[in-house]
From Swiss-Prot:
Any one GO cellular component localisation term in the record: cytoplasm
Superkingdom in the source lineage: Bacteria
Domain spans labelled RNase H type-2: 71-259
Protein name, as recorded: Ribonuclease HII
NCBIfam families: PRK00015.1-3
Uppermost EC category: hydrolase
GO terms (BP aspect): DNA replication, removal of RNA primer; mismatch repair
Keyword check for Hydrolase: yes
GO molecular function: manganese ion binding; RNA binding; RNA-DNA hybrid ribonuclease activity
Amino acid sequence: MPHRARDTVLEPPELRARREFPVAWAGAGPQHPGMIRKAPKSDAAPPAKGVIAVAPPSFRRERALLKRGIWPVAGCDEAGRGPLAGPVVAAAVVLDPKRIPKGLDDSKKLTAEKREALFEEICATASFAVAYASPARIERDNILRASLWALARAVQALPEPPKHVFVDGRDKIITPCDCDAVIGGDALVLSIAAASIIAKVARDRLMCRLAEDCPGYGFDHHKGYGVPEHLAALDRLGPTKHHRKLFAPVAAAWDKHAPGERETAAAPPDLFGLSASA
């Protein structure tokens, strides 16, 4: 039976180092496995105090498991918890240790152009799966449970069941194998970083398609987030079937455009499925 992995949530050594040593030297020389670089051995002037050199995500956790014969190892992340419209999109990725795309990082640190390029590289070299939690599921389960459900579904949809899973954040997901929750994992674990890119690009592309279905809301620009342009459209046009009606700005728009109907309106069915590729 599926079970939850160990109850403890890992605090990565990188984050512990950053918490315990808030000021660090940055410069040339061998890089510490975590987020702190050692003081330069050269005579070059040190950088200003308070600067922390942040290393890119690494493959060391996955490689350690691979050396123990534990493989495949999947990284999981989601995109779209905060928007007022559209689904939460979750991705699970198993990187090929011999064909890891260069430049993988937390999707939030990358430009849209770089994310798109890496998305194509990941799809061409890795196994992955994408799952969607629709606004209907978010309304039924709440945003956290819907997100965890989508993450678990993405893992289940992988072409080959993983033997270990790393998931971004504090919350583990229910899997048939061990699962480690890694706080800040999209900036620390390479497989999670890859999953963050897949989830982000998949969701952005979906929101651009929804913009064609719902003109006037600007979904292709803000991707459903509560920016002034979106709030103005909600106030002017009212909510669509893609909006999350329990989120406060959407609820206010419901009450303005259809008083009394928000609680009785039937939630639309799940409009999104899942996809996977080896």
